[in-house]
Amino acid sequence: MSETPIVSNHDLGKYVDQKVVIQGWVHGIRGSNARQFLSLRNSGKILQVLAEKEILGEEVFQTVKHLRQETSVTVIGNLVKNEKSPIGFELVMESIQIVGESENYPITPKEHGIDFLISQRHLWLRSSKQLAILRVRDSLSFAIRKYFHERDFLLIDTPILTGSVGESAGTLFSTEYFDLGNAYLAQTGQLYLETAIFAHNKVFCYGPTFRAEKSKTRRHLTEFWMVEAEVAFATHAENLKLQEDFVKTVIKETVQNSFQDLKVLERDPAPLLAYLEKDFPVIDYTKALEILQSKGEDIVWGDDINSEREQLLTVEFGGPVFIQKYPREAKAFYMKVNPEDPRTVLNADLIAPDGVGEIIGGSEREENYENIVQRLKEEKLPVESYDWYLDLRKYGSVPHSGFGLGSERLIAWICGLAHVRECIPFPRMMERLYP
């Protein structure tokens, strides 16, 4: 006689009207003195388990009745269809074994403050909404990789520890690196990613990046995940087309694969998908200033377009908008100077609506050796630290372009969340390094 199969909530359909073993955690319990309904979490889904005193006997039934939230258990019973249960099945319990007790679980069904929940992040991840966000994140990660692999991009794993500054020296995390001086946590994989376009034309990387920005806004983390792409021979205009297609494709695929999770989050994806049905407008930084000034904003050429002003522009255009050709002094050394207006560079930021803000930054890269050395000097960066990067401009240099997208902001937009701290399993912020 075969053993009773151990099954997960993921594939219950194969075992209807059979005796099965389910292992999981008590998500909740309710009932009467004759029967109890146990919500059992397994593989991220909730299975309803019916425990009847008449079947189990008084002693086992009382054990079930007094189970506490997050107790881990092994349950044996008969699996039946039940359209009224959360996932269409119900387990009629025959026996139960307690695997691990759970005493005084701190996150109860009552309301808790966000600071408390973040401090209990290692436990909060078990909640239905947080699990839904994790699944959306997983779906987005899959969609990103699928997009690039289907278009012949090669994944390049870029280093986390680096001796070169990728963005701003003022936002670096540094550490001593043996006898070689300081090493830095990577702000971007871009410089290393550029090396690989000479081998494979189209490449991307996807991993954690770090910014020591003293910012406490709802859009900033000190550690976040960024996907970056580089394409040999690509112009600024071609780069914009790639970015728009990339964003639209991965959002649509993620939403399609996350319908139930978005339902848990009470996120109606229809308004989000509607944004994707039209072309994203592209406006120059100078034009953006003119629009803002017409709305009474006190802003002059060279000023930063802050998050509030970004949102004014998304309202003006009714959705996402590219702002291109920013002042060169405000942007990184590797961005190509705009030949039509040397005050600016050939870059663009994609600004998302609904308070999300910038989700992509991209540019055409400077391919000329002398020009990029000059830009390094302007930024007061040590040229010798970039010898390896400058070699790329000596041996078969070509025009090329690329971009970077912060996945947490995109997740926040897809899920309709106000703060990026819930979009990564363990958020790192100015005031948060635990757990």
Curated annotation (Swiss-Prot):
It comes from the Bacteria. It is an enzyme of class 6 (ligase). Pfam families: tRNA-synt_2, tRNA_anti-codon. Keywords: Aminoacyl-tRNA synthetase, ATP-binding, Cytoplasm, Ligase, Nucleotide-binding, Protein biosynthesis. It catalyses: tRNA(Asn) + L-asparagine + ATP = L-asparaginyl-tRNA(Asn) + AMP + diphosphate + H(+). GO terms for molecular function: asparagine-tRNA ligase activity; ATP binding; nucleic acid binding. Its main location: cytoplasm. It is found in: Cytoplasm. Its EC number is 6.1.1.22. One of its GO terms (cellular component) is cytoplasm. GO terms for biological process: asparaginyl-tRNA aminoacylation. PANTHER family: ASPARAGINE--TRNA LIGASE, MITOCHONDRIAL-RELATED (PTHR22594:SF34), ASPARTYL/LYSYL-TRNA SYNTHETASE (PTHR22594). NCBIfam families: asnS, PRK03932.1. Homodimer. Belongs to the class-II aminoacyl-tRNA synthetase family. This is Asparagine--tRNA ligase. It comes from Leptospira interrogans serogroup Icterohaemorrhagiae serovar Lai (strain 56601). The lineage of its organism: Bacteria, Pseudomonadati, Spirochaetota, Spirochaetia, Leptospirales.
